[in-house]
């Protein structure tokens, strides 16, 4: 703790960029490294989840993510469930963002498009397309709309439900309606639930006690895209937040006699090195936004924005162009080959090589690797 003034202290925290992996074991071949992990009954070959935003995940994108061994999460409150011509609507948003120098012009259009009511049939059809492809089907809803939307999604055949907001707690209190008690809500569902985001040990532990299969750390913070720091004064020191959630996971594992809750890191991961450091800090998998938005399959055509950018009264995100010209395939972004020396392509290959150099052969073991912090 540090004193920031008389009678007021604050905790010193660390970002992923502050942390460095320290290899200290016998090196091994990257071919002998496994990046597989399992969330409840669902096995994935790579520890990568696509951030649930219309700029990224369409049914086709989610299917390709599944084919490549990852998980694409559809935004259940996005434009896909509101407009039949969603690709045309997103093209309009991108056009405004590219032409208008004022960033609020594209935000206003996003807000207008999100003002259209959700159509359960459209949303159900999108879920059905993913399910019919034979990949794991996951949809994100906000805490305030979880109770209303979940029955439709379960009926459509989702495998995983993601309850995600900027910040989430085990119980959401509302003066204008019934509070959402996650423990009760999750216990009544037949599908596993992933919940987040959380920033600290206590909230992570509380969410684990609700019965969630996974806990998301962070809210997808990305420089130039997310503006929760500017709007709310809230930001996430990801290295510290991941390590705190991992400590909560160990505590809950002891408390329950063996129930393992997965920690998913969402924010400030831009390269394969960041991905490796997130796992090293204790994450089981990462949630990626801008790195995947550079792919040809991404719905935003080289642009990225978070779901919070469309909030009707307090947007907390901006539109950012992340790719120009010809874009790489999603397969190249995830598994290569790469011609980029800075780690933006072959993300999983970079992770595998980092694990091999450090002498570890699976993700859970790699969470024990040595770390240092720069001055």
Curated annotation (Swiss-Prot):
CDD domains per UniProt: IMPDH
Q: What is its EC number?
A: 1.-.-.-
MF terms per GO, please? Answer: IMP dehydrogenase activity
Q: Site of the Isoglutamyl lysine isopeptide (Lys-Gln) (interchain with Q-Cter in protein Pup) crosslink?
A: 99
SMART domains xref list = IMPDH (SM01240)
User: Which is a GO BP term held by this UniProt record?
Assistant: GTP biosynthetic process
**SUPFAM superfamilies attached here?**
Inosine monophosphate dehydrogenase (IMPDH) (SSF51412)
Keyword set, alphabetical order: Isopeptide bond, NAD, Oxidoreductase, Ubl conjugation
User: Would I find Ubl conjugation among this entry's keywords?
Assistant: yes
Q: Which NCBIfam families match?
A: IMP_DH_rel_2 (TIGR01304)
Family membership noted in the UniProt record? Belongs to the IMPDH/GMPR family.
What name is this protein filed under? Uncharacterized oxidoreductase MSMEG_1603/MSMEI_1564
- The species this protein belongs to is Mycolicibacterium smegmatis (strain ATCC 700084 / mc(2)155) (Mycobacterium smegmatis)
């Amino acid at each position: 703790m540090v004193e920031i003034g008389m009678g007021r202290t604050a905790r010193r925290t660390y970002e992923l960029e502050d942390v460095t992996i320290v290899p200290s074991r016998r090196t091994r071949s990257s071919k002998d490294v496994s990046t597989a992990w399992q969330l409840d009954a669902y096995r994935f070959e790579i520890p990568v989840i696509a951030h649930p935003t219309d700029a990224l995940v369409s049914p086709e994108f989610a299917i390709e993510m599944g084919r490549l061994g990852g998980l694409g999460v559809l935004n259940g409150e996005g434009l896909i469930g509101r407009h039949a011509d969603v690709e045309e609507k997103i093209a309009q948003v991108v056009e405004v963002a590219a032409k208008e120098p004022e960033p609020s012009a594209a935000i206003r259009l996003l807000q207008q498009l999100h003002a259209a009511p959700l159509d359960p049939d459209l949303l159900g059809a999108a879920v059905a397309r993913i399910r019919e492809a034979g990949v794991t089907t996951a949809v994100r809803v906000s805490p305030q709309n979880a109770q209303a939307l979940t029955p439709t999604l379960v009926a459509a055949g989702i495998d995983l439900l993601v309850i995600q907001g900027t910040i989430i707690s085990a119980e959401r209190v509302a003066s204008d309606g019934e509070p959402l008690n996650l423990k009760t809500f999750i216990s009544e569902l037949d599908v596993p639930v992933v919940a987040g985001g959380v920033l600290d040990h206590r909230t992570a532990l509380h969410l684990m006690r609700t019965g969630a299969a996974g806990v998301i750390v962070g809210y997808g913070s990305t420089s130039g895209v997310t503006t929760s720091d500017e709007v709310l004064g809230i930001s996430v020191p990801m290295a510290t937040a991941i390590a705190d959630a991992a400590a909560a996971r160990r505590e809950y594992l002891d408390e329950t006699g063996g129930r393992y809750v997965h920690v998913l890191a969402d924010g400030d991961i831009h390269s394969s090195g960041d991905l490796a450091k997130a796992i090293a800090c204790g994450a089981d998998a990462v949630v990626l936004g801008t790195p995947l938005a550079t792919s040809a399959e991404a719905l935003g055509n080289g642009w990225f924005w978070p779901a919070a950018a469309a909030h009707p009264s307090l947007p907390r995100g901006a539109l950012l162009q992340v790719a120009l010209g010809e874009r790489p395939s999603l397969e190249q972004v995830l598994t290569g080959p790469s011609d980029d020396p800075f780690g933006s392509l072959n993300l999983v290959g970079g992770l595998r090589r980092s694990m091999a150099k450090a002498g570890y052969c699976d993700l859970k073991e790699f969470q024990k690797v040595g770390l240092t912090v720069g001055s």
